Amino acid sequence: MYFYVINNNLVKENKKHWERIYETKNIDGVSWFQKKPFTSLSLIEISNVNKDAEIIDVGCGKSFLIDNLLEKKYSKVSLLDISNNALKEVKSRTKNFPNSGVFYNSDILDFNPDASFDLWHDRAVFHFLTKSDEINKYVKICEKQINKNGYLIIGTFSENGPLKCSGLEIKKYSVENLKEVFSNSFKLVDHLNIDHVTPFD
C-alpha cells in the first residue's frame, strides 16, 4: 500500500460537537472550507485510480470534494462523517449525480464496514486523534479497509500549525513522524507542505 502526505502550516461528545458545528455554521463559515479542493483532487488524479475505483472521503463534513469527483465521472465515492447533519446536506446536494458510494454516519474509531477501498482520503480526522490507542486503532482500520496496492491520502497539521482546530486539541506531525506511524503497511510515495488559506484570510 502507498500513502501521500499533505502537511498543513469521547464519541458522544465528539458527535455533539460536530453536529453543533454543522447546525450553526454556514458551509463557508468554517476555516477548512474549499469550494474546489485543488490539492486533494490533484493527488487523487496522480494516484491514477480508475473512475470506478472505491473512494472514501473520511471526515467529509460538508466538503465539495465529492461534488468535484462526481463531476469528473468517478462513480463510487463514499463518505464518512460523525455528523449526520453534514451527510444529509451533502446527500441532498449531490442527489442528481450517479454514484454507487455509501454515506456512513460513524465515528472513525467505530468504522467497520464490509466494504474496502482503493483510495482513502482524510484531511479532517486523523489530526484530532491525540492518544496513542486512538492513533493505533486508526492505523489498523486503514490496514483493514484499504485494498492491497490502494492509496492513503492524509492531511495533518505540520509542526508549525496551530494547537487547536474548531476548539479541539490536535496532534501535529512532521513528514517523518507520519511516515513512521504508517510504516508497517504503507510506503511513502510523496508529500506536500501546504499553507492553507482560510475563507477568512
List each language-model region with its residue ranges.
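Class I (Rossmann-like) S-adenosyl-L-methionine-dependent methyltransferase catalytic domain
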Residues: 1-115, 129-141, 151-201
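Conserved acidic residues
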Residues: 118
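A conserved beta-strand element that flanks and buttresses the S-adenosyl-L-methionine
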Residues: 121
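Short, conserved loop/helix-junction motifs that constitute active-site signature segments
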Residues: 144-147
